[in-house]
């Protein structure tokens, strides 16, 4: 599952990225490990004030049931204070690992 993450207007990007890495990432990592997810990748924009999206998050599961269990298990951690949920794009897709491992 891939998320193009849109920040709320007038967000402090340094504080947002700090929260994302220090609070949200450990929460997602713990939940991924609990439900059998096998990869989690976060990319932050190098120029978020000029980009449409502040970052990208990729969560990898062996099958769709992992995503279902993740959604049922993840605990709120304040990320909603930073993210424009209506502007975020979510792609639930089948992944093929190709290229450089």
Range-by-range predicted roles:
Residues 1-101:
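Macromolecular interaction modules
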């Amino acid at each position: 599952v891939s998320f193009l993450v849109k920040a709320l207007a007038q967000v402090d990007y340094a504080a947002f990225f700090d929260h994302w890495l220090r609070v949200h990432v450990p929460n997602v990592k713990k939940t991924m490990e609990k439900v059998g997810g096998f990869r989690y990748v976060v990319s932050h924009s190098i120029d978020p004030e000029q980009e449409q999206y502040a970052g990208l998050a990729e969560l990898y599961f062996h099958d769709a049931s992992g995503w279902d269990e993740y959604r049922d298990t993840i605990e709120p951690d304040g990320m909603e204070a930073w993210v424009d949920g209506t502007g975020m794009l979510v792609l639930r897709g089948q992944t093929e690992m190709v290229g450089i491992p």
